[in-house]
Amino acid sequence: MKVILLGPPGAGKGTQAAGICERFDIPQISTGDMLRAAVKAGTPLGQQAKKVMDAGELVSDDIIMGLVKERIAEPDCANGFLFDGFPRTIAQAEGLKAEGINVDAVVEIQVPDEDIVQRMAGRRVHPGSGRVYHVEHNPPKEEGKDDVTGEPLVQRDDDQEETVRKRLGVYHEQTQPLVEYYSDWAAKGGDGAPRYIVIKGVGSVDDIRNRILSELERA
């Protein structure tokens, strides 16, 4: 099973990716992880990427595509893979197509912006342990305090409303063209066309996961 997972920040992609990977015995692949691993291993592509990143520049699509090809040739990709946060652009999507790297399904988790803002703005974190609470959905026993240590909880900068709205704006700007690219390709069919699956990301984690898995099992 080869899957591309799309969805806004705060949509629960990480949780759902883990469920998909477990069900189909496939690895979750993100470009960030690939870059870090290649730089750490000192591979030729990793060295190229390090030079670019050290100069404060964006890593080119050519390098990213090279890393993707290397990564999906690894033995753990025998059953497929899940791309998380890749492709980010039409150029990268076209690059996958040109390399003959086809996927079975593109899953888009849709959540209204206001729901995302509410979810993320309500998150509170215990810095020492990383324990996460939510003021409405998973509140601590005592307001503003960690259940285990009693230490104060904080709101991460990333979870503040203004930041969340900015990130959502960037997501829509970047991802809408990809949504159209893959949904059009799926509708037209043809060689290598994936199924395009839209999942409403509202409801319990288990409910959303079950809906995704039942759709993927038909892909």
UniProtKB/Swiss-Prot annotation:
ATP binds at G10, A11, G12, K13, G14, T15, R123, V132, Y133, G203. Its main location: cytoplasm. It comes from the Bacteria. Residues 133-152 have a biased composition (Basic and acidic residues). GO terms for molecular function: adenylate kinase activity; ATP binding. Keywords: ATP-binding, Cytoplasm, Kinase, Nucleotide biosynthesis, Nucleotide-binding, Transferase. Residues 129-152 are annotated as: Disordered. AMP binds at T31, R36, E57, L58, V59, G85, F86, P87, R88, Q92, R156, R167. Residues 122-159 are annotated as: LID. It is found in: Cytoplasm. It catalyses: AMP + ATP = 2 ADP. The keyword Protein transport does not apply. InterPro entries: Adenyl_kin_sub (IPR006259), Adenylat/UMP-CMP_kin (IPR000850), Adenylat_kinase_CS (IPR033690), Adenylate_kinase_lid-dom (IPR007862), P-loop_NTPase (IPR027417). It is an enzyme of class 2 (transferase). SUPFAM superfamilies: P-loop containing nucleoside triphosphate hydrolases. Its EC number is 2.7.4.3. GO terms for cellular component: cytoplasm. NCBIfam families: adk (TIGR01351), PRK00279.1-1 (NF001379), PRK00279.1-2 (NF001380), PRK00279.1-3 (NF001381), PRK14527.1 (NF011100). Catalyzes the reversible transfer of the terminal phosphate group between ATP and AMP. Plays an important role in cellular energy homeostasis and in adenine nucleotide metabolism. PANTHER family: NUCLEOTIDE KINASE. Belongs to the adenylate kinase family. This is Adenylate kinase. The gene is adk.
